[in-house]
C-alpha cells in the first residue's frame, strides 16, 4: 500500500513537472500584451512597438501594445502588478518604475518586490545644455559660475519630479552647487524659455535638443551618461568633463509580474536580446539617440536595485514629491 502511494505521488510530481516544462516550451501560445504608461508616438512607445513587432514575428503570436498613460505611469504599472503571473502581460517601463515609489505617497507597489526584471532594453542619453549667451563654455566653468551666483543659477525642467529635475538634484550634490529649479508643464515650454534666454540651462533629452544644438541655438556642455552619445560624438560625458561616475539616463525596460516562472522570464529576455542584435533594429534605435542594451534578467535586477538606492537618496534629500 505504501509503495503504491509513493508511486502515485511520484507520478503526480512527474506530471506536474512535465506540464510546467510544456508550458515554458510552448510559450507563448496566445497573444501577449505590452502595457506602457506613455502615450502613443513617444520614444518609449516607438521602442515598444518595434520590439513588439519583432517578438510577434519570432513567436508567431500577436503582441499587442496598450498605452495606459496617467498618474506618472502608475496606472499601467498597477495593471501589470495585478495581472496573472504567466508572462502574457508585460510592462514596458521607464525610470518611473524605479523612482515613483519615492515620488508618490500612494504607490503601493515596489519594483523589487512586485515586479520581476526581464530586460533593460535601451538607455536614452540626457545632455546638459545652456543658452549660448551663458558665460561658461564647459562643465568646470558652469560649476564655477553656479557657485558664484547667489542662490545658484536657474535651471529649467519639464516638471517637478521629471527626469530633468532628478538629474539636476543629483548634479547639485555631485558638483557641490546650489540651484533654483524652475519647473515647467512639459519639455517644450521649458525649451522655449531656454531658447529665449529666460533661463540659462537645463538637462534635456539628446533627441529633443539636437536640432537646436545643430542650429547653434543651444550649447551642449556634457552628456549625463557613462558613454558618449552617437548623435553628439564630440560632446564629453560628465566623467570626462570632471564628474567621475555621474550617470542619469532615460530607460526603456520590460518587466513582468513577480511570480512569473523564471523559465518564461529567461525566454522573453533572450528573445529580446536576439532582436536587439538585428542590424536594422539597432540602426533604428541608435538613430533615435538610444543606447542599445538588452540585458539579462539578473543584470537588470541588479541595475534596478542600484538605481533605486541612488534615486531614493536623491529624492529624499531634496524632499521631492510629485503628488
Mark where each language-model region is.
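An extracytoplasmic/periplasmic, membrane-proximal ligand-sensing/linker region
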Residues: 29-31, 174-175, 214, 240, ...
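A ligand-binding cleft/hinge motif common to bilobed small-molecule-binding domains
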Residues: 97-106, 170-174, 201-235
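N-terminal signal peptide c-region/cleavage motif recognized by signal peptidases
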Residues: 14-22
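Beta->alpha turn/N-cap motifs
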Residues: 92-97, 157, 187, 204-209, ...
Amino acid at each position: 500500500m505504501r509503495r503504491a502511494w509513493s508511486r502515485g505521488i511520484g507520478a503526480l510530481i512527474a506530471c506536474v513537472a512535465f506540464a510546467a516544462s510544456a508550458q515554458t516550451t510552448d510559450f507563448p501560445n496566445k497573444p501577449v500584451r505590452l502595457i506602457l504608461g506613455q502615450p502613443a508616438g513617444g520614444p518609449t512607445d516607438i521602442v515598444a512597438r518595434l520590439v513588439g513587432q519583432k517578438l510577434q514575428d519570432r513567436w508567431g503570436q500577436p503582441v499587442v501594445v496598450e498605452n495606459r498613460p496617467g498618474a506618472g505611469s502608475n496606472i499601467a504599472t498597477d495593471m501589470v502588478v495585478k495581472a496573472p503571473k504567466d508572462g502574457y502581460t508585460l510592462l514596458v517601463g521607464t525610470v518611473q518604475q524605479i523612482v515613483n515609489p519615492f515620488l508618490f505617497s500612494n504607490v503601493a507597489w515596489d519594483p523589487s518586490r512586485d515586479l520581476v526584471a526581464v530586460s533593460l532594453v535601451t538607455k536614452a542619453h540626457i545632455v546638459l545644455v545652456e543658452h549660448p549667451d551663458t558665460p561658461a563654455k564647459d562643465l568646470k566653468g558652469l560649476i564655477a559660475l553656479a557657485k558664484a551666483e547667489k542662490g545658484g543659477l536657474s535651471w529649467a525642467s519639464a516638471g517637478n519630479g521629471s527626469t530633468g529635475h532628478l538629474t539636476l538634484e543629483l548634479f547639485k550634490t555631485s558638483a557641490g552647487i546650489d540651484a533654483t529649479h524652475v519647473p515647467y508643464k512639459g519639455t517644450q515650454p521649458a525649451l522655449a524659455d531656454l531658447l529665449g534666454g529666460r533661463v540659462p540651462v537645463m538637462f534635456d533629452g539628446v533627441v529633443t535638443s539636437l536640432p537646436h544644438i545643430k542650429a547653434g541655438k543651444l550649447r551642449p556642455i556634457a552628456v549625463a551618461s557613462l558613454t558618449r552619445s552617437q548623435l553628439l560624438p564630440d560632446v564629453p560625458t560628465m566623467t570626462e568633463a570632471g564628474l567621475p561616475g555621474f550617470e542619469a539616463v532615460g530607460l526603456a525596460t520590460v518587466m513582468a509580474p513577480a511570480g512569473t516562472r523564471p523559465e518564461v522570464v529567461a525566454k522573453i529576455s533572450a528573445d529580446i536580446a536576439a532582436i536587439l542584435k538585428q542590424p536594422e533594429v539597432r540602426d533604428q534605435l541608435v538613430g533615435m539617440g538610444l543606447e542599445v542594451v538588452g540585458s539579462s534578467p539578473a543584470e537588470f535586477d541588479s541595475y534596478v536595485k542600484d538605481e533605486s538606492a541612488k534615486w531614493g537618496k536623491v529624492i529624499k534629500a531634496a524632499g521631492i514629491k510629485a503628488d
